[in-house]
């Protein structure tokens, strides 16, 4: 049995709560301590909502799940919490698919589409680390997406998979090997790889995904007794120090004891008979025969190997659960855990819609004899099931929706920013002559060495406007979905570094463009009714100019819409509160000074301490072979992309090119000699 580590949350920050943060922290904590289930933090852009959340977690000292509506924002939150809580377990749980084509059937074409998927190994590793941390300790913060409500294996089975190894333990190499295999690790006769183990004489090495850092465990035995355990670098094999013991968990969170497989087989067979009889009774002989062939093949594979393709469709039988819903990430948390729903006005509707889409696809598979009805239970949670799993929740948004406002016991405003910055002034201008007017406003900002964001309604408009501005001598680039992730990050980096002055985009909300150098946001066609010009979207877009003391928003329109009017009124309300507060407290707003750098060097330095070499020595090749140098950098590049650390990925990509070029030159010189 694993005894959970009881470590307090330690918040590392150069700053103390300021502005509206102390009041917001106190009010939300009081509401939670009173036992209220729902509370809302209504915080403007740049008010430090993440820092407020961090303080609540630290003060209440409870495990926390923070959910966001996309991977990019989740990755940003993950990095922030990693910085705030360096001594605690901060984990990342998002979809591990780079490509996913679900199993489906199109009746109109009599077309069955097999499941196809490409799994991202690094994301999968982070998911394993998440459930491992939750099994081992309480000081855990998990940043996740909608993946948190999708089906997982039994948390009890996973916790029971834990095996401890310690110095002085009486155990043979064969027994160790059998345990590793039971936990789904594979033996390798080649170089040690992640999630594999090797045996050389009396030495066993294993590299588990569940551990943070690129290190493996080396177990040294003498006459069926463990005499030494070391941590060693997975790449250089350098000894990183001795340890008395370590606990190993299964390499998968879908742990299925073989006895469960044996118990499931007769249940599956029984349901197969019932469903085949149902088809026959309704004249569906083709469906009955199809189902019989498919399921009987799966049963044979389960008998022989304990596994079959699409085994998740039999999770209802294999889990041993009597619940009507599947297990999910929430089940791995203790009962007193806290939930924070970031950007709740977007995230909650996303969670609400997951079940229906999944159900309609699988219903076709069941109705046409491709799957048993039990396959419907391998699914995301229904919204009411999601709500039932919530212990206590804080909705976080600058623009909370009706649901958050109606359910919450308290809705706490966080309007005053610690920096004293106020919401931007808003000017409305008719669209007649808007291009000339926009060009004039851009020139004013360029003269002040400030930046501009322009939002349009279509990709074509953004490209045409960018071309128009470039022809006028403006340093501008467009930003939209046809650019890949690294290209988008490069464009944003160019803006921050003053290599361009203007970005033209469509949905600038999703890009995470909180850039302090931006002092002007221009909204074209601000009056057009639709998602990108709703009250909520307009308020969020206005916030892009809220990190600069000269922040200004210009809305170009033909006729002022209701959404425009509501967004302007709400922004002006907040702006007046902020101005009054600054006057009362003699505060002069100052633009946020955000250092233009990436976190590559810091992360690499941390990794260097673990794996035993310096970044500079990686480049010069003083510690590792040339092949391993490039392999290591490629590994870091893949990890950076998976973590959404795209600026780091760009630097790593360039380093790989640089190193490859040096190796190529060295080879050519060698040939000449």
From Swiss-Prot:
Family label: Belongs to the UvrB family.
GO BP: nucleotide-excision repair; SOS response
Domain remarks in the Swiss-Prot or TrEMBL record: The beta-hairpin motif is involved in DNA binding.
Gene3D superfamilies, sorted: P-loop containing nucleotide triphosphate hydrolases
GO MF annotations, alphabetized: ATP binding; ATP hydrolysis activity; DNA binding; excinuclease ABC activity
Intracellular or extracellular location(s): Cytoplasm
The name this protein goes by in its record: UvrABC system protein B
